[in-house]
Amino acid sequence: MLVLFETSVGYAIFKVLNEKKLQEVDSLWKEFETPEKANKIVKLKHFEKFQDTAEALAAFTALMEGKINKQLKKVLKKIVKEAHEPLAVADAKLGGVIKEKLNLSCIHSPVVNELMRGIRSQMDGLIPGVEPREMAAMCLGLAHSLSRYRLKFSADKVDTMIVQAISLLDDLDKELNNYIMRCREWYGWHFPELGKIISDNLTYCKCLQKVGDRKNYASAKLSELLPEEVEAEVKAAAEISMGTEVSEEDICNILHLCTQVIEISEYRTQLYEYLQNRMMAIAPNVTVMVGELVGARLIAHAGSLLNLAKHAASTVQILGAEKALFRALKSRRDTPKYGLIYHASLVGQTSPKHKGKISRMLAAKTVLAIRYDAFGEDSSSAMGVENRAKLEARLRTLEDRGIRKISGTGKALAKTEKYEHKSEVKTYDPSGDSTLPTCSKKRKIEQVDKEDEITEKKAKKAKIKVKVEEEEEEKVAEEEETSVKKKKKRGKKKHIKEEPLSEEEPCTSTAIASPEKKKKKKKKRENED
């Protein structure tokens, strides 16, 4: 029987010399107490050594996944097939794969496990040609490599480098700004016109470093640094300059400062390229969405890429504007719409009225990109490119929405609505609460009110008529009494057939009398008088 034994140095295949002693499982460990006893049980038949740690890592990752490495396949075909003996393996899954692909009989049992323990205890004596120090070094290196592989760890994906690089880049910008401002003020006493002619700071320092004193500009060749027109202007200004004379020691110190500025500028460009490469390695999708600098500042502000991935989109949107946020919450005003994400190119190219909306959408897509870069296995930037294209299309639709045709239809014309202030008080209309019809009731009530008004008016008119008729009747009765008394005095006997009015008679009889009868009665009274 053959035994396949894997080590950190290579593959070892042993030949079992005495298979009878394998039957006693409990006492098998006694046979491996010393290297001499172990050599009586097993003997090394073949040893396939690994060339380096990378090869060992590939072999062991294949064994962990239950696969056969190419190197192992060659060894098994060469040695085990020729021997025509069963193969003892430590992993039952690996034995099944070997049996399936190479058609070799494999054994896995408690006896094999005990045999593997014995071989491992006397490995230095059973495998000649391998020093213990080399074995320990290979074992340690393989353990570290295997741990990195299991944890998906990569040295290129350490976001601490990004945090330090962006912090250093900001510090360099501040130092460069201070140095250049000091250099311009310092050399401005000697040649003040040069600062107005050359606006670029790096070119300004290179000119100073090349020329030095103002008197040397007439003979200096600045064609490598400046265009011909600017060079001629500088030389003309140097001849009629209003600056004061300075000593050689002052010029030396100014030139030394210019050298510092140029070196720091070159290092800054190198650091920026390093930051770009790191960002594309660690967070490619975030880099596509917001750019290298904004992405690095977001990671540095959160502390790490994993901490940033735990933030919500609303938090990422205002990350960097904490002072303004707490100030707004304290004074109960509107909170800020954006923080560090404001410096992204998508937000910068948007019109002011759409900046808040675009920053919100960009924050949502950026959070997806951050989580994909932090927890995803794929290191491509395809998702970031796709999401950026969607945001750019959305931005175009927002920008085109405000453009209307001059001779447009009613749809194109904007509807002006009445402005209502927030503090305007609105009353509640309870008419919408009832589900019963209210129109018929209102109409009935209105009709009843109108009828009541008509009846009241008629009653008032009737009362007025009755009063007028009563007054007329009283006048007529008084006139008749006076006429009867006069007739008695004159002795005229006239038979007047009149029925006395009773108090109980209805007063409507006189009211029915026509106006013609009244006229006749008046004429009679006049004749009698």
From Swiss-Prot:
Modified positions (Phosphothreonine) in chain numbering: T34
Keyword Transmembrane: no
Residues with the Phosphoserine modification: S109, S304, S351, S483, S502, S514
Post-translational modification note: Sumoylation is essential for high-affinity binding to snoRNAs.
Residue ranges of the region described as Sufficient for interaction with NOPCHAP1: 155-400
Key words of the record: Isopeptide bond, Nucleus, Phosphoprotein, Ribonucleoprotein, Ribosome biogenesis, Ubl conjugation
Domain Nop: 282-400
Biased composition (Basic and acidic residues): 414-427
Entries under SMART domains matching the protein: NOSIC
Comp. bias (Basic residues): 485-495, 517-529
Tissue distribution: Ubiquitous.
Primary location: nucleus
Cross-link Glycyl lysine isopeptide (Lys-Gly) (interchain with G-Cter in SUMO), sequence positions: K467, K497
Cellular component, GO, one term: box C/D methylation guide snoRNP complex
One Pfam family this sequence matches: NOP5NT
UniProt-annotated stretches for the region Disordered: 409-529
UniProt record similarity statement: Belongs to the NOP5/NOP56 family.
Assembly description: Core component of box C/D small nucleolar ribonucleoprotein (snoRNP) particles; the core proteins SNU13, NOP56, NOP58 and FBL or FBLL1 assemble stepwise onto the snoRNA. Interacts with NOLC1/Nopp140. Interacts with NOPCHAP1, NUFIP1, RUVBL1 and RUVBL2; NOPCHAP1 bridges the association of NOP58 with RUVBL1:RUVBL2 and NUFIP1. Interacts with PIH1D1. Part of the small subunit (SSU) processome, composed of more than 70 proteins and the RNA chaperone small nucleolar RNA (snoRNA) U3.
Function field: Required for the biogenesis of box C/D snoRNAs such as U3, U8 and U14 snoRNAs. Part of the small subunit (SSU) processome, first precursor of the small eukaryotic ribosomal subunit. During the assembly of the SSU processome in the nucleolus, many ribosome biogenesis factors, an RNA chaperone and ribosomal proteins associate with the nascent pre-rRNA and work in concert to generate RNA folding, modifications, rearrangements and cleavage as well as targeted degradation of pre-ribosomal RNA by the RNA exosome.
UniProt-recorded name of the protein: Nucleolar protein 58
Lineage start: Eukaryota, Metazoa, Chordata, Craniata, Vertebrata
Gene that this sequence comes from: NOP58
